[in-house]
From Swiss-Prot:
Enzyme's top EC category: oxidoreductase
InterPro entries assigned: FA_desaturase_dom (IPR005804), Fatty_acid_desaturase (IPR012171)
Catalytic activity: a (9Z,12Z)-octadecadienoyl-containing glycerolipid + AH2 + O2 = a (8E,10E,12Z)-octadecatrienoyl-containing glycerolipid + A + 2 H2O
Histidine box-2 (motif): residue ranges: 131-135
Compartment(s) where it occurs, according to its Swiss-Prot or TrEMBL record: Microsome membrane
Entry EC no(s): 1.14.19.14
Tissue expression as described in the entry: Expressed exclusively in the developing seeds. Not detected in leaves.
The protein's name: Fatty acid conjugase FAC2 B
Family label: Belongs to the fatty acid desaturase type 1 family.
Record lineage: Eukaryota, Viridiplantae, Streptophyta, Embryophyta, Tracheophyta
GO CC, one annotated term: membrane
């Protein structure tokens, strides 16, 4: 198959008819050992990433500034990207903990997840609770939690104004730099809550949470405050610029990776969104897409369909589990191997809003479009 034909096939829409299989059919196809999550194996991956992260921090803190200026201008960006990737890998382990896919012990998962996410300035329990709602309502126009597309009827002046090479570049840079932080702080790309109030992951009274979760949200905030205070103390000793170089920029890289990965997993011309007249859980879970984000080297970013179907499966079993269900999924499974930056550019250009097709009998099914 030629490149043009292959690119066209990637953009073919997934079926919207009722799947010829049930959820239990998929579960039976997954090898039972894929659901096992031995603590020893999970700890191996955790300590591996912690050790690499600490080595990178140590080298950056003690040696890069000693290099000649022309050489440090090369080494610093290499460090920023490498450390950003490994911070992202650690963040993903914390995300695994929130799904109880790190070990068989929930208290272990919550302890590890809290420590990791707090170190990466993510309120663990707050994100765990909102992310649970995302998995419960994936690709629902009304109830999903993140990356909810705009309808054509909504204000789109800014989106259309920026749909040109310069505008797209500015939009991409802004979203990659600030998108993740804006989501955590202000629920950017999240759903609109009818009850009002500040929809922030840092606000215990936020409509994102119910009453039984608010104390855990406060506990997460305390953890973040401790880390921020530690950062402040480090800055008073080392100065702002060294701290920004060693931790700040890698954190921005991590944030960009997380925003881009989740955006690409839920944004594609071939993937539909549904309103309440058409949505059901299986439809939503199947409306995700597997991508090859090789630079991240984390299976949860590659195999996202299986993650939404069975979030308890640990990332090191995700590939095997995916291969087991692909024959059953058939055309309902979507994979796009388009290179990362090319895919990000295409999706930001082509996926501006969603609307139902003209003449479509079922008006509750929405597809990405970009026509004015």
């Amino acid at each position: 198959m030629g490149k043009a034909a292959s690119a066209k096939k990637v953009l073919e829409r997934v079926p919207i008819s009722k799947p010829p299989f049930e959820y239990n059919d998929l579960k039976k196809a997954v090898p039972p050992h894929c659901f096992s999550r031995p603590l020893s194996r999970s700890l191996y991956f955790l300590f591996h990433d912690i050790i690499v992260t600490c080595i990178l921090f140590y080298v950056a803190s003690n040696y890069i500034h000693m290099l000649p200026r022309f050489l440090s201008c090369i080494v610093w960006p290499v460090y920023w990207i490498s450390q950003g990737v490994f911070l992202g890998r650690l963040w993903m382990i914390g995300h695994e903990c929130g799904h109880h896919s790190f070990s068989n012990y929930r208290w272990v998962d919550d302890t590890v997840g809290f420590l990791i996410h707090t170190a990466t300035l993510t309120p663990y329990f707050s994100f765990k609770y909102s992310h649970r709602n995302h998995h419960a309502h994936t690709n629902s126009m009304e109830y999903d939690e993140v990356h909810i597309p705009k309808r054509k009827s909504e204000a789109l002046y800014f989106e259309f104004l920026g749909n040109n090479p310069i505008g797209l570049m500015i939009t991409m840079l802004c979203k990659l730099t600030f998108g993740y932080a804006a989501y955590i702080m202000f629920n950017y790309t999240g759903k609109k809550h009818k009850s009002g109030g500040l929809a922030s992951h840092f606000y215990p009274q936020s409509p994102l949470f119910n009453d039984s979760e608010r104390n855990h949200v406060l506990f997460s905030d305390i953890g973040i405050c401790i880390v921020l205070y530690a950062c402040y103390r480090i800055v008073t000793v080392t100065g702002a610029m060294p701290a920004f170089y060693v931790y700040g920029i890698p954190w921005v890289i991590m944030s960009a990776i997380l925003f881009a990965a989740t955006y690409l997993q839920h944004t594609h011309p071939s993937i539909p969104h549904y309103d309440t007249t058409e949505w059901n859980w299986l439809r939503g879970a199947l409306s995700t897409i597997d991508r090859d984000l090789g630079f991240f080297n984390m299976n949860k970013t590659h195999y996202h369909v299986i993650h939404h179907l069975f979030p308890v499966i640990p990332e090191y079993h995700a590939q095997e589990a995916t291969e087991a269900i692909k024959p059953i999924l058939g055309q309902y499974y979507k994979y796009d191997g388009t290179p990362f930056l090319k895919a990000l550019w295409r999706e930001m250009k082509e996926c501006i809003y969603v609307e139902s097709d003209e003449g479509q009998k079922k008006q509750g099914i929405y597809w990405f479009k970009n026509k004015t």
